Amino acid sequence: RGEPEIIELANLEKEYYRLQFLVDAGNEHLKREMEVSIAAGEIVGLLYDAFYKQYANPESEHSLKSLNKLCVRLVFCLYAEDAGIFGHHGMFHDYLKGFDTRGLRKGLVDLFRVLDTKLQDRDPYLKDDNPELAAFPYVNGGLFSDENIEIPPFTDEIRNLLLEKASENFNWSEISPTIFGAVFESTLNPETRRSGGMHYTSIENIHKVIDPLFLDELKAELDEICANPVERTRTAKLRVFQRKLASLTFLDPACGSGNFLTETYLSLRRLENKILVELSHGQVTMYSASESPIQVSISQFYGIEINDFAVTVAKTALWIAESQMMKETEKILLVPLEFLPLKTNAFIVEGNALRVDWESVVPKSKLNYIMGNPPFVGQALRTKEQSKDVVDVFGKGSPETKLDYVLCWYKKALDLMKCRPQVLCAFVSTNSICQGESVPTFWKKICSEGAEIQFAHTSFAWSSESNHSAMVYCVIVGFTAKSLPAEKKLFTNGQCKLVSHINGYLLAAPDVWIASRTNNKPDWLPKIEKGSEPSDGGHLFLTPEEADCLSQKYPSLVKYIRKFTGGNEVINSKPGEVSRYCLWFLHGNPADYAKNSEICERLQAIRTLREGSSADRIRKKADEAYLFCQIRQPESDYIIIPRHSTSSRRYIPMAYTSKDIICGDSAYVLASESRYLFGILNSNVHNAWCRAICGRLGMAYRYSPAVYNNFPWPAPTEQQKAKIEQTAQAILDARALYPDSSLADLYDELTMPPELRKAHQDNDRAVMDAYGFTKGTAARTSESACVAELMKLYQQKVSAAQSK
């Protein structure tokens, strides 16, 4: 939830960066690159499908790997002819056009062999026999070295696809290697294709990681050097800075198709080209054959990737990036530079990053930055191999094994960083790692060992281009293994705020560790419990029509047919509206229903269901099929709190409910009619606390006992308490003005009635007064400041309890 940005004019020169959210970072060039890259991926997909049909055994491992390598080679050739790497434009196209469909396969095999052969090692008579083939340069780099690749026979369709759609009608030199690498890998990865299409990390999201990690600082340093008015000093510093860029080493331990590495390489080369502009002054600059004006190299980039094909794509994407930036350098220096044969190579290793010793990939003495977007998989969705990975990293029985898979990369990174504390790391991760149980379980441990968050992006939506994938909500966390004195950068909704500390909840607040099993609530507070759990397969539930029918047919059952509510009902039902009923036989007389065939049929189905359950606690309840599996129904009227609620609402909808209405386990119950309790729970203070520490389902709030039991309650005067009771009642009165509206209607930020909004605002002020958040204090106007004060109160309460 965004807060107002206040920038004093006197500080504008230093704090202008905080206005960055006003600027549209996108531009037509980036948009064009993205469109071209996605179109390129679609062309590759067509080629892939056409070739796939031609293999004798397309599902064999050898055929699939051959098909992937074939597509990578073709893409490199298509790019090389459009970028002028091979020589004249259209060279690859013209060579292929000289073959009919039957001869095209052999022509391609011959070309691949020539591209992998040094000029001095080629047949000396090749120029006479086949001058078109002999004109192709030596590529190097290992891209064409595997002669065991299986190339199937061509068809007219493939020939036309390759010559017309892929070559004549498309310009491959315009692709973005950052985007295309990921799109390409997604297009050709069978698992990804089956899951619904293309996936890639946008350039914008990559920069959310690399800009605060290192790029912003490098840009600022270069700008400062360029502003030096003394040419001799400026030139010397530019050369030192260029050597600095060439000395930096990067590791992406889950590099996929290399998009983080590729975009980082492009960013460093753009800085280097800016240096060359300053040094050359627009004049032709001569270099000897043994030296190059370019010092930044793809050999500074290291990656680990479990998928063999993605490794090949990553290397190819970096070569394409190298070629594109070399063209830019040529324009600056006004001299031609030789791209082929490939002289450098990125160090992308195929392997499981959680079982590979990272120092065997890159010596820690060389390493400066670790970054990437490791896979995030919840405990319930892990494969057996992934579960084994987690145990290998954290140890058997460790509480961290129940957390998200992505935290394994944090642990491996920190283990390396402890030996080289100057290394900085930043990962994209699921937002769950900074919520709920992850904070006291993982962050408490690593922070106690010296780790510190240097910058973070709070939760934001991360969508792929897949047609079927659900929206994912992510955070970005940049951290070190040791404390640094510098201010931290906290990004929320695209706005950056400089703060002194960022805690595990990604708040500008002190470190607090709120575990779900702790209970720090005052004695006067009612216990919070989940509603009753049916575990009945739906057989104890009735629609309104079924309830009416049973009541008329069997009057003795009327007292057992009860209204039912839960999280969905309390939010979406209108007052008095009942969408579900349930059979509630607690303390019932078996004579009323034991011989009822309709009831017995339902109970037998429940018994069978429970007997077959994998959960021991459910199997034990098979003999009590007439009862809910877990009964936690209050004996008095109660407050109902839905377990899940959308984050688009400022207040979590809560309501009073009659003890005669059965509450299910999709909501929590508080056996209380206290207006004071209701007022506090419905305040902006309690909702801010919930937003800060609760778990999430996507971005939806996941209320829990940990939120309630650890909430720091105020110590109000009798007058303040009475005021809160009045404002709480005013909320209920305002709701009652709209009997045809559900809480979902009333609490929609766009349609909230003015009477209800005013009642909540009055209640908010009354509660803040009880906390001492008086007018003019930061906690009164800023949610983050309010949460910071609540965390201080929580820490004081815990410390006081521990000292007793």
What feature does the model see in each segment?
Residues 90-94, 221-246, 268-299, 322-342:
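Flexible phosphate/Mg2+-sensing switch loops adjacent to catalytic phosphate-binding sites
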Residues 668-710, 717-722, 726, 730-734:
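Basic, amphipathic alpha-helical recognition segments used for DNA target recognition
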Residues 166, 230-249, 294, 341-369, ...:
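Flexible, glycine/threonine-enriched loop-and-boundary segments that flank and lead into catalytic domains
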Residues 255, 598-606, 621, 713-804:
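Non-catalytic DNA-recognition/assembly elements of restriction-modification systems
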